[in-house]
Amino acid sequence: MKTNWTIIGVIAILLATQASGFAQKTSELFIPLGQSPGLSGKHTLIGKIVQVNALNNTITMADTSGTYSVAMVPVTRIYLDKSKAGLPNSQGALADCKVGDSIEVKFVDNARSKPAEWIKVQKAP
C-alpha cells in the first residue's frame, strides 16, 4: 500500500512540474519585458535592436556585454509588450521589430547558438 502512495506522489509531482512549464509558456505573452519569473536576466538576453534582416529572419541585438545575432525559425513567437503604453500585450511579427526597440530573447534550450524560442519587443508609448 505504501508503494502505491509513493507512485501516486511521484506522478503528481511530475504532472505539477509539467503543468507549470506549460503555464509559463502560455502566459509569457502577458508578462512585461524583463519580468519573466526564473528566466529574465538568467536565461534571456535583454538589450536593444541594432539591425533587422527580414530576408534572413535575423535580428541583431546589443546589450552591455556585446552584440548578438538572433536567428528565428517558423515557431519563434514574437510578443509585443505594450504595458508602458497602458495597452494589452499582443502577438507580433518580425515587421514589428524596429531598430532601437528594447527586446528580451529566450533561446531554445537556453543556448545562444540556437534560434530564439520567443522574443519580446517593448513598444514605447
Model-derived segments and spans:
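Short, flexible, surface-exposed loop segments at domain boundaries
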Residues: K2-I8, I13-A71, K82-P125
